[in-house]
Amino acid sequence: MNYPHPIIAREGWPFIAIAAVVALLVHFIAGFGFSWLFWLLLIFVVQFFRDPARPIPTQANAVLCPADGRIVAVETAHDPYANREALKISVFMNVFNVHSQRSPVDGAISKVEYFPGAYLNAAVDKASTENERNAVVIEMAGGQTVTSVQIAGLIARRILCYVRAGEPLTRGQRYGFIRFGSRVDVYLPVGSRPRVSIGEKVSASSTILAEL
């Protein structure tokens, strides 16, 4: 599913409209001296839901970062969604990051699975297994499997996923959104070479997470 509006995420349009109407009403009723705070809030809401276009690396064996944020885990772990041992790389998104998720690789979706759960701080490790989450398992043409998991956080309470099993995905394609801070775990085949380290800031699509 191609996303036709690359500047402001459509998920934010209702919030932007409400903030704009409130700012205008206060401005007309009470003047700028009272409404400036609401205009500032509108600016914050617009920047929060920004969704800029990103350059997409063309390196054939590259796994792209699915989200903006900070790397909080690079480790060997069990991938419960594809039932295998894997290299796990986790990205934590705070409230100031872009909140759309993009496909890390080209492939076909073999499974989309949703799990209800808790709303722990998404930066902690147990959020991967205890929080509300949605897993997308992607099978690549070369036989490799890549799993991308959207995980809700302490404030984020709604995971949006726009793809289904059987559909194709292309690297950098926008496939989901999580509001107000969250986490994305990526599980890669054992032997993949990580290109990021813990604490590093990363950008969706333009940062290479690892090489297969």
Swiss-Prot record:
Gene Ontology terms for molecular function: phosphatidylserine decarboxylase activity
Cystine pairs:
none
What cellular component terms from Gene Ontology apply here?
plasma membrane
Q: What is its EC number?
A: 4.1.1.65
Instruction: Identify the residue position(s) of the site Cleavage (non-hydrolytic).
Output: G181, S182
Q: Which UniProt keywords apply?
A: Cell membrane, Decarboxylase, Lipid biosynthesis, Lipid metabolism, Lyase, Membrane, Phospholipid biosynthesis, Phospholipid metabolism, Pyruvate, Zymogen
Post-translational modification Pyruvic acid (Ser), affected residues: S182
Q: Which residues form the active site?
A: S182 (schiff-base intermediate with substrate)
Per the record, membrane topology reads: Peripheral membrane protein
The keyword Lipid biosynthesis is annotated on this UniProt entry? yes
Quaternary structure and partners: Heterodimer of a large membrane-associated beta subunit and a small pyruvoyl-containing alpha subunit.
User: What is the recorded function of this protein according to its Swiss-Prot or TrEMBL entry?
Assistant: Catalyzes the formation of phosphatidylethanolamine (PtdEtn) from phosphatidylserine (PtdSer).
Protein's name in the database:
Phosphatidylserine decarboxylase proenzyme
**Its encoding gene is what?**
psd
